[in-house]
Structures are given as C-alpha cells and as structure tokens.
C-alpha cells in the first residue's frame, strides 16, 4: 500500500481476511481501495471463489453491504461471510430507521418504517425463501423483522416461527427471536382494550424483567454479566414499546395510561391531569396490566400529595398545604436543617 500498489494491497488483505480469522479486524481497517478500477483489479487477482467473496465482503463493509450480499450470494449461497454482511446491512438500516430522544424523565423511541430500503427488503426476502444459506434462520429473522416494518404481520410471524424451529436451541438465539416476535406483536396492535392488553401482557412482563436483569448485571458487574441472558439488546425495544403504547393511549384520550407508560415533562402542569392521576391511584386498580403500568412509573400517590402541598405552600395557602403533607406518608430525612442553611457545613 505504501508503494501505491493499491490493487495488490487490497487483494492481499482479502486473502488475510479469508484465511486468518485472528487478523480479520486488521484486514478490514487496512483495506482501502482508492477507486473502482483498483477494486476491479483486485478482483482479477483472486484465485478462487473464496478470495473473491472475501474481497466483496470487505467492499461491503465500506461501501454497499446490500450489493456485496448479492455478489457473494451469487458466488456461493453458503459462504460464511454472508451472515456478517447481513448483520452489517441491518445495523446500517437500523441507524436510518430508529430514533430516540431523551426528554427530562424518559427516553422516547420511534421507528420510521417508511425509511426501509426496498432493495435490501427484496433481497433478504428472496434469500430467506430459498432457504439455502449457511445460517437460514438468520435470514428468516431479518425477513420477519422487515415484514413487520412493512406492516405484513402474518408474514412476519411465519418467518419468525420458521426461524425458531431451525435456529440453535441456545438461550441467546431463542430470546433474540422472541424480541422480534414481541416487536411484531406490539406493532400490529392498533387499539388497546382488555383483550389486546391481556395478549401483550406476558411478553411485555418478560421483556421488561429481562431488561431490568441486564441493567442490574451491567451496573453491578459480576460473573452474571457474561451470561447469555444478559447479552440481549433490549433497551431500544423497551423504550420503543413504551412510547408506542403510550401514543396509542393518547390517541384514545386515556391520558393516565399514556403517562404511566411514558412520562411527559409537563404532565402535572395541568391541575385536571393531576387530579386524574390521583383518582387513578386512589381507585387502587390491581389488574395485572395496571400493575405492569404502575411498575414502570416513578411517581407515587405520596409524591402527588407532596407536590400538591408544595404548590399550596408557594401560594401561601398553608392550611391546605398541611392537609396534603399529612396525607403523604413518606418518612424522608432531610440532609440538613433548612432553617440554618446559612451556616457553613450545615450538612455536617
């Protein structure tokens, strides 16, 4: 490469990539075709299909993974690098499709289905249906994922069921398929009522508990961190599902349930909303769905009483404030005496 023999250099990196797994990262990072003609010259140097597929794989990392998949699949449908290219292509698609924003108390996540590249959708569907790759279940998973994005929920279910049957019976793999099945199930839900809530409940309980377990294992590092159950990427699906359900409730004018699933930064700015939430908590609803929603929410009835008391105090309505504070059963200890705060080191 330093001698500006780019075609030869890149061909050699492809050989390393193909034959020396331990140096694959180095081969990827050092692969630098300058122009199309350099890449074509490298292709002409290949001695077999394996080298040619490796060269296209490196091309796919930097340029167009979808084109690379098409080329490698034509060379050899069972080539070992196809799975890597598929993963790369999906990651790029997700960067275009998925969006998250952090608004004070919560993370809200959205999926823009319209941004799905039709080229990769068509190619993955064709390959999945032919079922002749080295890891057919991975193509079934991605095909199912894409069908969900296209709104073809029955097709998605078929692909994911096929993936579940043919995939290795490992916890990580099977749970990953389950995540896509949950995404499909939530996506096809357009109205929330007792029936749809009960249908969603078991999978959402599993998902949110799984996410808590992963967060705890990550925060408090232990041997459990390396367990397969803790390697799942659940955070976006958790955030997206809560945002999606919250938006459905909002469309149905159910402000309380919408708030429980995804907090709004100004929800309590309106007194009528505060009263609705207080009434909800006082009704002490204890269905399994309500318990799930309440477990996701960080505000309690005591917090509402305290907030109301503070608001009354600001308005110099002391008697009303005392009434609200008496309802609040929280036994918090102040870090310092608020009446001698002017004294230095009052916290001590």
Q: How would you describe each model-predicted region?
A:
Residues 1-348:
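Extracytoplasmic/secretory-pathway proteins
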């Amino acid at each position: 490469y330093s001698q500006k023999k780019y075609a030869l250099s890149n061909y050699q990196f492809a050989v390393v990539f193909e034959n020396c797994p331990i140096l694959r990262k180095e081969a990827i990072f050092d692969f630098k075709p300058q122009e199309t003609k350099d890449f074509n010259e490298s292709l002409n140097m290949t001695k077999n299909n394996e080298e040619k597929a490796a060269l296209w794989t490196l091309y796919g990392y930097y340029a167009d993974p979808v084109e690379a998949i098409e080329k490698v699949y034509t060379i050899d449908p069972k080539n070992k690098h196809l799975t890597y290219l598929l993963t790369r292509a999906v990651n790029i698609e997700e960067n275009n499709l998925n969006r998250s924003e952090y608004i004070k108390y919560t993370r809200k996540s959205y999926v823009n289905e319209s941004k799905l590249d039709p080229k990769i959708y068509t190619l993955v569907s064709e390959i999945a249906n032919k079922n002749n790759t080295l890891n057919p279940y991975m193509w079934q998973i991605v095909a199912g994922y894409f069908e969900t994005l296209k709104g073809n929920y029955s097709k998605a279910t078929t692909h994911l069921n096929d993936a579940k049957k043919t995939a290795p019976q490992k916890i990580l793999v099977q749970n990953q398929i389950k995540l896509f099945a949950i995404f499909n199930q939530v996506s096809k839900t357009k109205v929330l009522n007792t029936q749809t809530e009960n249908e969603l409940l078991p999978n959402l309980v599993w998902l949110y508990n799984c996410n808590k377990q992963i967060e705890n294992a990550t925060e408090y590092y232990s041997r459990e961190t390396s367990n397969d159950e803790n390697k799942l990427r659940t955070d976006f699906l958790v955030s997206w599902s809560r945002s999606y359900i919250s938006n459905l409730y909002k469309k149905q004018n159910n402000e309380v349930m919408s708030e429980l699933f995804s907090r709004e930064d100004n929800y309590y700015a309106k007194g009528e909303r505060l009263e609705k939430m207080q009434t909800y908590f006082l009704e002490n609803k204890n269905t399994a769905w309500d318990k799930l929603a309440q477990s996701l929410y960080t505000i309690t009835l005591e917090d509402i009483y305290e907030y109301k008391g503070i608001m009354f105090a600001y308005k110099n309505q002391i008697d009303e404030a005392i009434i609200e504070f008496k309802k609040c059963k929280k036994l918090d200890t102040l870090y310092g005496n608020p009446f001698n705060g002017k004294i230095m080191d009052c916290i001590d």
